[in-house]
Amino acid sequence: MLYIEPYPDPQRECERVSNVLAQELIEAGVHFGHRASRWNPKMRPYIHGRKNLIHIIDVRETIRGLLRARKYLKQVASTGSLVLFVGTKRQGAEAIAREAGRCGMPYVSDRWLGGTLTNFRTIRNRLARLEELEVLIPSEAFGAYSKKMQSSLRREHRKMLRNLGGIRTLSRLPECLVVFDPKKEKNAINEARKMGITTVALIDTDCDPDLVDLPIPGNDDSIRSIELVAARLADAILEGKAETAVESQAAAEGAEGGEGAEGKPKPKARPMVAKRSVPKPKA
């Protein structure tokens, strides 16, 4: 007799996923905020309580923010748009660069250069200069330069690679910025707001959530916390890309089968951010 496994109840499945995610977040220390004396009152709705002078973030709010951010980033990636990861804290820079690279997106992990978004043409010119140096230095023509000039060009290349290496694939303005600690990356946030670019951010209890479109309340100082959130967001981007690849393949097969124009995938609309509902402050 053929046994067909029953389809899981959506409500129970959602609760199961949330419980597993909550356990992972707690183990990573995502719920630990800053000292209560350093808090931003606007973060009150996202705070569960206080323990030993440290604010404890409500993990349910972290899950809610993370799921909303994942859904949005999946939509962005499915349209072929770019997502720029930004995190220059020493403890999280390596993880952010790794996860951004894993999902094929540009990143800034060393220092935010003023005008990266608002003066994008200049940034593109600097990237062109970086490519020029990378062609010149290994070439035979480089040997014709004096020792002093060679040293100067190598130094220029190292500096540009450190500052611009992560955004060399930024061929156009990104659709979204993923920021880790908007308080530290305030210049990036300000530029994104000026350019109308959506912001997703891991925000601690000392941050202003009103400056971010999709806040994820959580510890932005812990390495494990940053790694976990960055990995989850990168996974969502990869899912969106995979979705597009499947649709493109199906469209190509349809075109080969004689469907003509009907086999072409329909262009996807630009992802929209739903109006954020702020939880009521806890008594």
Regions found by a protein language model. Give the residues of each.
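Conserved nucleotide-binding/hydrolysis micro-motifs of P-loop NTPases
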Residues: 31, 89-92, 112-118, 182-186, ...
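Short hydrophobic alpha-helical runs that function as membrane-insertion/retention elements
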Residues: 83-84, 106-109, 178, 198-202, ...
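Residue-level signature of catalytic and energy-coupling elements of molecular machines
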Residues: 29, 85, 177, 229
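Post-transcriptional modification and biogenesis factors for structured RNAs
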Residues: 2-8, 190-194
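N-terminal cationic and glycine-rich segments that engage phosphates or anionic surfaces
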Residues: 3, 11-81, 88-89, 93-136, ...
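Short glycine/threonine-rich loop/turn motifs
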Residues: 187-191, 195-247
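Extended, charged alpha-helical interaction scaffolds
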Residues: 147-179, 183-200, 204
